[in-house]
Regions:
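Active-site-proximal or metal-binding-adjacent scaffold patches in catalytic folds
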Residues: 1-180, 190-226
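Walker B catalytic acidic pair
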Residues: 186
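Walker B beta-strand of ABC/ABC-like P-loop ATPase nucleotide-binding domains
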Residues: 183
């Protein structure tokens, strides 16, 4: 749906309010109640025109600092919130190695460096999230059915209606406290599948300072990429 010249992806669900999101790629999404007709949706979005343009302007400003990484000696890559440099080596390694605060990659594997970095992040995230999930699921009284690390396009994580919880492999780039927030956020969706005040109250019970992590993602999320 195009409103005021902006192409907005409409997502209908069993919710009571209309929420607007600027996705990580700059596209605009609106999550709306299923019962609303198209004209009603258009009127609501038109009334939120200022908010939409304000959020788009903020996204543009934040993304001016986006980094395009090359797989060369000295290039930095994020891991758990810190940047570490890459060193290409002559010896044959199995994938990406991380040792002594340095990434190592065989020169012969440079042509598939992105693929190998993705595997590195997936493996590391898998090893990190399960103990954290175990801790917080008990505090929240929830039980996710299945945990997956995968490509999620414009989301850091997702909680499915069937109880599965998915995490983007890029979450391995975030600081550990931000990773804790992302996990708590998704587990709280097993209680409230929305972003009502009741949902945020659940998050706040576990992480009273979660606003700090939300702000970190807003400012630095653009750099969590390859």
């Amino acid at each position: 749906m195009i409103v005021s010249g902006v192409d907005i992806v409409i997502q209908k669900s069993e919710r009571k309010t209309v929420s607007i999101f600027i996705e990580r790629d700059g596209s605009v999404s609106a999550r709306v109640p299923e019962k609303l007709k198209d004209e009603e949706i258009r009127d609501i979005l038109k009334a939120k025109e200022y908010q939409i343009f304000k959020n788009l302007a903020e996204w543009t400003q934040l993304n001016e600092n986006a980094v395009e990484r090359e797989y060369v000696n000295g290039q930095s890559f994020l891991y758990l919130g810190r940047n570490y440099r890459l060193k290409l080596v002559e010896e044959k390694l199995e994938g990406v190695h991380f040792n002594r605060n340095t990434f190592f990659l065989s020169k012969t594997d440079k042509h598939k460096a992105k693929e190998l970095f993705v595997k590195f992040y997936k493996d590391k995230l898998n090893s990190k999230i399960h103990p954290i999930i175990e801790r917080y699921k008990n505090q929240l009284g929830v039980e996710p059915k299945q945990i997956k690390v995968m490509e999620l396009q414009n989301r850091w994580a997702s909680c499915m209606p069937n109880g599965n919880v998915n995490f983007h492999w890029k979450c391995a780039m975030a600081p550990i406290d931000v990773l804790h927030y992302i996990i708590v956020h998704e587990l709280a969706h097993l209680i409230h599948n929305n972003h009502t005040q009741a949902f945020w109250n659940e998050v706040d019970k576990i992480l009273p300072n979660y606003d700090e992590q939300v702000n970190w993602l807003k400012i630095n999320g653009v750099g969590m990429d390859l």
